Amino acid sequence: IYNITVKKQAPKKSEIKQFTKFYKECFIKSSKEMGNDWYAEGDDFLHDKWIEWDDYGYIRGMSLEAKEILTEINLPWFKKIQYFGSVTGNNLKSIDLGNNPTLKYFFLDVGYGESAEEGNYPYLNKIDFSGCQNLEGVYINSVFNIKQIDLSNNRKIKTVNISHTPLDELKMPKTDCLKEFYMNWSRINELDLSNCTNIQKIGIIGCNPQSVTISLGNKTDKEISEFDIDVYSADVETSVRFVANREISEVPKVRYEYGYLGYIDGGLDFLRNCI
């Protein structure tokens, strides 16, 4: 684990180069210990692809691929971070988001060429988002031991995409910011979106149990008719029941397609926004 501490006060210009050099040395050393030889020392690949800095040497964003080295992430070290992401983070045991009012995007994903069945993040069972008041996007893919996610305090969230993560419970905030919600292969059988007053897109793919009830709250027929709803089932039949203070027998514009709207609209676009 490399503990990277940034000074609270803005550093001098001469210190910025020292910070940058230190960050790069840490990640180059991590890559060497992993046996990676695709980089060349002295290249600016860390600045362009992995880490971004602001004018004062603070880390603005980070994307990790170290599979064996990193076991815990403590984001309170990074006082001005805007996004954090990890792929192939199979040994991660904890992610402490701390009180990060600047964090906007968070994602966990599988590594390149890896399948969702390879036991990604086997030790990670909790992520606390409560201190991230400006969080706008969450993308979580193939985290098999997280059973509960609480987003109830994240009232500025715009996109939620949770894939191949067998949740038992998902708590949503009271907000008019959330526009897109996508979920697949969870164990949730009841989902309350009644407090998400401005939601526009919902994507649901094969869940276990195969019947999911989604509460839309006090929505009018006109509001519901303008929803973009995608229900897709691959190996098993998926039944989604929508209720809005009454049972809705037929929701206009529901699309049953071969393909998952959530991955296309929520996943890839979200990752492009982050990196």
Where are these regions (language model features)?
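N-terminal capping/linker segments that flank leucine-rich repeat
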Residues: 1-83, 91-104, 112-116, 130-133, ...
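Conserved positional slot within leucine-rich repeat
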Residues: 63, 74, 85-86, 96, ...
